[in-house]
A protein has these predicted regions:
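Adenosine-phosphate binding glycine-rich loop
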Residues: 137-138, 157, 163, 261-368
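General beta-strand structural signal in soluble alpha/beta enzymes
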Residues: 84, 110-113, 134-137, 168, ...
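Solvent-exposed alpha-helices and their adjacent loops that cap or buttress functional pockets
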Residues: 34-39, 75-76, 101-103, 127-128, ...
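Rossmann-like adenosine-cofactor binding region
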Residues: 211-280, 285-287
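Short, ordered loop/turn segments at secondary-structure junctions
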Residues: 48-50, 58, 87-88, 113-116, ...
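Glycine-rich phosphate/diphosphate-binding loop of Rossmann-like nucleotide-binding domains
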Residues: 53, 58-78, 130, 136, ...
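N-terminal ligand-binding/catalytic initiation module
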Residues: 1-132, 353, 359, 363-367
Length: 369
């Protein structure tokens, strides 16, 4: 406990009759719940277990160890109390209804391991209906760290954001979010690929998320396979599956290519296959250099959002987090094998949280009391 209960006076303050004064104050001004209750530092980690790591749809019971691990990371790196909640809910309506009902207990909602395309609808509806931050980490945590790594990679290659063509393999939760944040950062063009091939306007076999992606990317309407659209591209970002591309594909890219092969546990191409071909290579694995890991993002993002008493997590807050993560790598440290900081760098949250909080103020999403 954070408050001692050693005598009758302590008990009367912690519970009845003293607690009634706090209850009445919150009844009259519900925003005070973010000041006087656990809401001020507690995030629900909600999953239905339909898209767990590389394991797939393993159900809520199977997902629980991942959510427990997430709670540990929230506390260890961000000082945030994360509460794992795995629910037996298959549809978007069920998940949205559940989260709306438990929202009064929490200061934020971290959605986790919910399959696409339902994850897009769930997050969108919850953001619209709740006055606390809602963040699908599989989408935005990955996107934020990817952008941070790309910014630092450009310092090495000398390329400019607005001149880049980026190919994204995998247009699911992470792929769509990466595309969005890259566009918001001023990227030249993005081309997404799924199992059918390149995403472009007018193509068939697309859900609503891919329809959005098609309408906002691939301005030249390139068609064909992943190998076709990689020709002349500056950056490859993989969030799909193992062994998807070859050394020949990387060789066909523009000069000084950047390759982020982030499929886990086995990347789209292994670093040893592009040694001497790629200027910068990153994966999602801890046993290779440049691990693009969400733990670099979500503790600081929620720490900043809670500290600011924010009601949402905006695109500006995500961009601020990406910049702060990128700047955690000093000029002296920056190298092709070190474009993202170590997850054990304890200064990252100290940089990310205030940057996110300041962005929340700029974007006007601070709770008014």
């Amino acid at each position: 406990s954070t408050a001692p209960v050693n005598d009758r006076d302590d008990l009367s303050m912690a519970y009845t009759p003293g607690v009634a004064r706090v209850c009445t104050a919150i009844e009259n001004d519900p925003s005070l719940s973010h000041k006087y209750t656990i809401r001020k530092n507690t995030v629900a980690i909600v999953s239905n277990g339909t898209a767990v790591l590389g394991l797939g749809d393993i159900g809520p019971e199977g997902a629980m160890p991942v959510m427990e691990g997430k709670a540990l990371l929230f506390k260890e790196f961000g000082g945030v109390n994360g509460f794992p909640i795995c629910i037996n809910a298959r549809t978007a309506d069920e998940v949205v209804d559940f989260v709306q009902r438990i929202a009064p207990t929490f200061g934020g909602i971290n959605l986790e391991d919910i399959k696409a395309p339902e994850c897009f609808e769930i997050e969108e509806r919850l953001r619209a209906s709740l006055d606390i931050p809602v963040f699908h980490d599989d989408q935005h945590g990955t996107a934020v760290v990817t952008l941070a790594a790309l910014w630092n990679s450009l310092k090495i290659t000398g390329k400019k954001m607005e001149d880049l063509t980026v190919v994204i393999a995998g247009v699911g939760a992470a792929g769509v979010a990466i595309g969005k944040i890259l566009l918001n950062a001023g990227i030249g063009d993005v081309i997404g690929c799924d199992r059918v091939g390149a995403i472009y306007t007018g193509r068939g076999e697309m859900n609503s998320a891919k329809e959005w992606f098609a309408a906002n990317t691939n301005s030249s309407r390139k068609m064909g396979t992943i190998s076709d659209v990689m020709k002349g591209a500056d950056v490859f970002v993989g969030v799909s599956g193992p062994d998807l591309i070859t050394a020949a594909d990387v060789r066909s890219m523009a000069k000084n290519p950047i390759v982020f092969a982030m499929a886990n546990p086995n990347p789209e191409i292994r670093p040893e296959q592009v040694d001497g071909l790629a200027s910068v290579m990153a994966t999602g694995r801890s046993d290779y250099p440049n691990q693009i890991n969400n733990v670099l993002a979500f503790p600081g993002i929620f720490r900043g959002a809670l500290d600011a008493n924010a009601t949402d997590i905006t695109e500006g807050m995500k961009l601020a987090a990406a910049i702060a993560i990128a700047e955690s790598v000093s000029d002296a440290e920056l190298s092709p094998d070190f474009v993202v900081p170590s997850v054990f760098n304890r200064t990252i949250v100290e940089r990310v949280a205030p940057a996110v909080a300041a962005a929340a103020v700029r974007d006007g999403v601070i709770r008014k009391s």
